[in-house]
Amino acid sequence: MKISLIVAQLRAYCPAFSGRVSAGIDWDAVANSAQLSHPSAYVIAAGDDASANDVDNAVRQDITDLFDVVLVLNSTDERGQEAADLLHDLRANLWKALVGWRPSVEYDPIEYGGGSLIFISRARVVYRFSFEAAFQLGRNRASEPAETWEEWKLDGLPAFEGMDVDVDFIEPSDPNLQTPGPDGRIDAQFSVDLPQP
């Protein structure tokens, strides 16, 4: 999933951050480079999970994209009591901005996955909230764009325009055969032309 879409959604619908939302693929790298005022939010691409292929003649998998929203708050005490109350309010804002929202048409609505403390000190609290959204890899209709190598390869084949059929009937009473079965002589022929869209 494009995390820039998540950043834009949080900037638009979480006024508590006053636009202080950034993103990256690794929390340590983001924490060392993005120095925003607090409270601030950082969207981190956390990976994806894939189900097994569920069809025999194609590729179709359910993929769940995972991302974290890491909040960084100022803390006035080592216990984080005041920060815990603020985290409760900010979590509600994150839910309003993200849960049920579809980042693009191929995704199911975003779901909340839970939260956990990353770091606390006398000056700062860092807390992670996890979210996920699922989509299907592999198209449902041939008219949709190819998403896998197999679909791309099949799209390159010529259209199935028709077929020619030769029929050799089984003739178990033919005295020329030692065993019953087809004799190798074509008994009927026909062609089928298929209409093209």
How would you describe each model-predicted region?
Residues M1-N57, Q81-H88, G156-P197:
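Small/polar-rich, solvent-exposed N-terminal microdomains that initiate assembly or binding
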Residues A34, A58-R60, I120-R122:
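Sterically constrained small-residue positions within well-ordered secondary structures
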Residues S40-Y42, D85-E150, G156-T179:
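Acidic-leaning, charged glycine-interspersed low-complexity segments
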Residues A52, E78, G138-A142:
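Intrinsically disordered, low-complexity acidic/polar segments
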Residues R60-D77, R124-L137:
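Oligomerization/assembly interface segments of phage tail-like spikes and tubes
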